[in-house]
């Protein structure tokens, strides 16, 4: 197939869009692959759609290869199934909700577990019908509060979501690993650099969960890994390496001190280092010796607000993402002045475990707060702190919570070495959902013994439209895009850089030969200057550029590798076959 640029619906831009933040956003707009319509909404122009379709087909091929069957649900969905699973409430403001003319509630689907479950329940009734893998490639909708980075985080996006249905957990594990391997093949074919990390399931539910993150400095996800062992996890899923408990017997009694004007960790440490505390003879007090109690209010879906206190070592901040993941599906908010007024036992800057536990406030602590550890913390009165408060003796928390920030250098949960952090973009997520959704809809089939068996599910997503931006993010240089061959809009970009009629005719004939050999050819037959054409060729990012220019009269054309920048001359007579051999 030959596409002539003189006929192609394309306009490139010389300057970056004013609101574009990341390289992929800038380049996809400048190169005419997409155009913004509104916040988080984009039109796919011909070149962008070609890349998108190639990614889509690779995903489809690999899903079919593991036995997946493609179906397609509507994007407009009724409220009832999502009410059954409580996700009508759990999704909160991220859900696009609407009503029809009869005042019935609908939503634009953010994900389709409910529909897949109901469909399988309605069609199959025997263990003989399983295992089963169904998938769709469908447009999804989420009302992002701050759409950003172009198609990396939009309000409308295309995902491949597949679901496995099995009669036992062994079948689920098999389907999970089939998808895991298929995803690795997909990303290898796409040329994406990625890492597989342990993850949390969030509103999706389920147990085992892994994310595929494309390594990128502009990624919104932080992950950590241990270079010694290969352990890797999304920061929300990192488990703290718990220290051994310390002996309680023989530790000095806790003492309350006057600590004027010390409502913060920094001022408290300053006070402690000037107070000549016997507990710290011979060493300086640090923030890690203090116990910081962070107060929030928590609300389960459909429930009322309740107080929650989170105790973390004072040298650590509470990580919003980790706290949110730990509390999922509940939402949380910081206390305001009215909350403090309603609960006078909460003394701002001086809150300690005693008042919390005495007044029935749920109190969860960092896993490092093990029995026998002694802390400096609030004494529940203005300008007073307690020194030497021992966990397991002076207070017993209601449990632990993984909410403290994870830092470079923290010990890996597997004990193999330190953690190092990096950033990534989520491109795939696989879950062993178990029976959360089949329980909600009583999705049973008759087992081999004639008794009902509840189906177990897996859920597996890939961001198809996001992958266009991810590849652009990873594969570009200062000149423009550089598409891997598997997803490039064309195999070869033929540039006519010679105004001679013979050269134009020859270039057209060469493009025809390449077409007959099965290559997809972009022919720049415009009457623009060579400089404009070269800049566009570099911006558009087709992996191989053939220049029909000054060398035409000497019987040669130039072949350029868009990735390496290497150039070489090849004879006109053998150009088509030599280009084919190089490209394929």
Swiss-Prot record:
One of its GO terms (molecular function) is aminoacyl-tRNA deacylase activity. It is an enzyme of class 6 (ligase). Its EC number is 6.1.1.15. Its main location: cytoplasm. GO terms for cellular component: cytosol. Signal peptide: none annotated. PROSITE patterns: AA_TRNA_LIGASE_II. GO terms for biological process: prolyl-tRNA aminoacylation. It catalyses: tRNA(Pro) + L-proline + ATP = L-prolyl-tRNA(Pro) + AMP + diphosphate. It comes from the Bacteria. InterPro entries: aa-tRNA-synt_IIb, aa-tRNA-synth_II, aa-tRNA-synth_II/BPL/LPL, Anticodon-bd, Anticodon-bd_dom_sf, Pro-tRNA-ligase_IIa, Pro-tRNA-synth_IIa_bac-type, Pro-tRNA-Synthase_IIa_type1. It is found in: Cytoplasm. Keywords: Aminoacyl-tRNA synthetase, ATP-binding, Cytoplasm, Ligase, Nucleotide-binding, Protein biosynthesis. Disulfide bonds: none annotated. Consists of three domains: the N-terminal catalytic domain, the editing domain and the C-terminal anticodon-binding domain. Homodimer. Belongs to the class-II aminoacyl-tRNA synthetase family. ProS type 1 subfamily. Catalyzes the attachment of proline to tRNA(Pro) in a two-step reaction: proline is first activated by ATP to form Pro-AMP and then transferred to the acceptor end of tRNA(Pro). As ProRS can inadvertently accommodate and process non-cognate amino acids such as alanine and cysteine, to avoid such errors it has two additional distinct editing activities against alanine. One activity is designated as 'pretransfer' editing and involves the tRNA(Pro)-independent hydrolysis of activated Ala-AMP. NCBIfam families: PRK09194.1, proS_fam_II. This is Proline--tRNA ligase. The lineage of its organism: Bacteria, Bacillati, Actinomycetota, Actinomycetes, Mycobacteriales. The gene is proS.
């Amino acid at each position: 197939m030959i596409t002539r640029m003189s006929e192609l619906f394309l306009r490139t831009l010389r300057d970056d869009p004013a609101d574009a933040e990341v390289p992929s956003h800038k380049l996809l707009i400048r190169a005419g692959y997409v155009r913004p319509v509104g916040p988080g909404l984009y039109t796919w122009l011909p070149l962008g759609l070609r890349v998108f379709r190639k990614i889509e087909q690779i995903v489809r091929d690999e899903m079919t290869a593991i036995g997946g069957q493609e179906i397609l649900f509507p994007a407009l969905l009724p409220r009832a199934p999502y009410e059954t699973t409580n996700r009508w409430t759990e999704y909160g403001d991220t859900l696009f909700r609407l009503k029809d003319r009869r005042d019935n509630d609908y939503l634009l689907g953010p994900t389709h577990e409910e529909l897949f479950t109901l469909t399988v329940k309605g069609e199959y009734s025997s263990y003989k019908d399983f295992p089963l893998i169904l998938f769709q490639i469908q447009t999804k909708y989420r009302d992002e509060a701050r759409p950003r980075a172009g198609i990396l985080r939009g309000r409308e996006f295309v995902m491949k979501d597949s679901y496995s249905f099995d009669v036992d957990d062994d079948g689920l594990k098999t389907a999970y690993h089939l998808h895991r391997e298929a995803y690795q093949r997909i990303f290898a074919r796409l040329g994406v650099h990625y890492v597989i990390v342990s993850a949390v399931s969030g509103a999706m539910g389920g147990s085992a969960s892994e994310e595929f993150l494309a390594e990128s400095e502009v990624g919104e996800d932080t992950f950590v890994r241990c270079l010694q062992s290969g352990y890797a996890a999304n920061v929300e899923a990192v488990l703290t390496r718990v220290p051994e408990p310390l002996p309680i017997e023989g530790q000095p009694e806790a003492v309350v001190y006057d600590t004027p004007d010390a409502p913060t960790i920094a001022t408290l440490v300053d006070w402690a280092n000037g107070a000549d505390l016997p507990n710290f003879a011979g060493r300086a007090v640090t923030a890690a010796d203090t116990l910081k109690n962070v107060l929030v209010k928590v609300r389960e879906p459909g429930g009322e607000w309740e107080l929650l206190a989170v105790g973390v070592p004072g040298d650590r901040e509470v990580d919003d993402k980790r706290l949110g993941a730990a509390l999922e599906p509940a939402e949380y908010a910081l206390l305001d002045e009215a909350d403090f007024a309603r609960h006078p036992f909460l003394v701002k800057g001086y809150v300690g475990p005693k008042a919390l536990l005495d007044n029935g406030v749920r109190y969860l602590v960092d896993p490092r707060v093990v029995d026998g550890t002694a802390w400096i913390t609030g004494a529940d009165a203005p300008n007073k702190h307690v020194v030497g408060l021992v966990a397991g003796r002076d207070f017993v928390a209601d449990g632990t919570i993984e909410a403290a920030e994870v830092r470079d250098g923290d010990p890996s949960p597997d004990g193999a070495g330190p953690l190092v952090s990096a950033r990534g973009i989520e491109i795939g997520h696989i879950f062993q959902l178990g029976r959360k959704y089949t329980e909600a809809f009583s999705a049973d089939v008759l087992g081999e013994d004639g008794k009902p068996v509840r189906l177990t599910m897996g859920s597996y997503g890939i961001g198809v439209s996001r992958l266009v931006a991810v590849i652009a993010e990873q594969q570009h240089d200062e000149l423009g895009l550089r598409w891997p061959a598997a997803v490039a809009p064309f195999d070869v970009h033929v540039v006519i850089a010679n105004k001679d009629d013979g050269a134009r005719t020859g270039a057209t004939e060469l493009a025809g030969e390449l077409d007959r050999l099965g290559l997809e050819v972009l022919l720049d037959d415009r009457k623009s200057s060579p400089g404009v054409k070269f800049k566009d060729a570099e911006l558009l990012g087709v992996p191989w550029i053939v220049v029909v220019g000054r060398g035409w009269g000497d019987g040669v054309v130039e072949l350029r590798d868009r990735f390496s920048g290497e150039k070489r001359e090849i004879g006109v007579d053998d150009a088509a076959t030599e280009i084919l051999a190089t490209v394929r």
